Amino acid sequence: MGQRMNEENQKQDQKDEIAGKQEEPGQIVSEKVEKKREEKPKKKRLRIQGAAWRRLDNTAKLFAAVSGEDLSSVFRISAVLKEKVDPELLQRALVRTLPEFENFRVKLRKGFFWYYFETNNRNPGVEEEQSAPCRFIDPHRGARFPFRVSYYGCRINFEVFHGLTDGLGALRFASRLTEHYLELVKKLPVMVQEREFSPLREDDYLRHYRKLPHRHYNSRPAIAIQGEFLPFDQMAVLQGTIEVSALKTECRKVGVSITKYLAAVLLWAIIQTETDGKTLKRPVALNLPVNLRNFFESETLANFFAVVNISWAAGKAPEALEEVIASVGRQMDEQIVKERLEETISYNVSNEKKWYVRAIPLFVKHLAMQMIFLHSTRAHTMTFSNIGRMDVREELRDQVESFQLLV
């Protein structure tokens, strides 16, 4: 009680001291001037990146320009649980997850020179899946988030616009969303995890950019998969499952990693089904994303990946799978090294840094990037992506049947 009164007296003494100072006219003027000087920077701070807006990273600018109803640039990570999903608990889990990923609380805006992300203060909602997966997320319809959370039966779906994040960022979000949902289902205490990645660092491409002699992307047209086109509003999804232990056994037999083995098998399958198996008129090529965080210091949850082209050249077709495995292994060992990836970063960022490119209005950039993108897509037959191990913490694993990726 006495201590409380002493504190109140000290506060009153401070007020009296301030009041005494205000009786000096000269000091009032100086204090007002100082206050004005201090207030100016505060107004500027509101426009600092990460507070109300931030630039798109180097890769996101391309996705924002080329995406639409016919090319959504949306990919999906799903968690298949052992029990039917409760929509109300999933909504609570989403509200609990979003504050852990501050760079996801945004909406896409269009500026005069570039697209940018603006803070979105609304709460996202969950929805029951009723249409095709990976639909375009139109940023101009309301204040939409650049991601979608849906459910169907025992499955939780997290679909995200590739301009917001890459496979690692989406994997982190989907895992935490699943964990928070299962915490609510099982009435477990919330497990707070230390942040492994910084949510507000916006572009590690620029941070690791060095002006280097760089290689241009391969633009020679590759073999295209033939088949019957589905109607615009339909999509075919094929899913296969294999035991990891059995897959590792096959990889050990030929002495390669899982990624090398599956990439080689995919190339071999395309050659067997799309050619006569003897001669290739065009190369068969895979577009393979590479996580740059494995080679450069990075804490970003924005995009930070590069793509490499793994192919079998035009001409004589391989006679056995072992030939393709050996070729794929050599190509990946040569291309997926820090020096080559630095050249890729240099090429991508150097175009953005040119003053005359920065000065071009967005609608002109938009058309140019669409043309460049369409030209570059002809250089690969298919995209093959391995985003790594998908998991939840140990005490929740018995509630999860599997994880799925759909690009």
What kind of region is each of these model predictions?
Residues 112, 153-154:
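Residue-level signal for tight coil/turn positions that link beta-strands
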Residues 76, 154-155:
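Short acidic-rich active-site patches of cyclic nucleotide enzymes
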Residues 82-100, 159-175, 239-276:
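Acyl activation and transfer enzymes in specialized metabolism, enriched
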Residues 157-159, 309:
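Short hydrophobic beta-strand segments that form the core of ligand-binding sensory/regulatory domains
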Residues 26, 30-58, 164-172, 176-249:
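Non-catalytic, low-complexity flexible loops and terminal extensions
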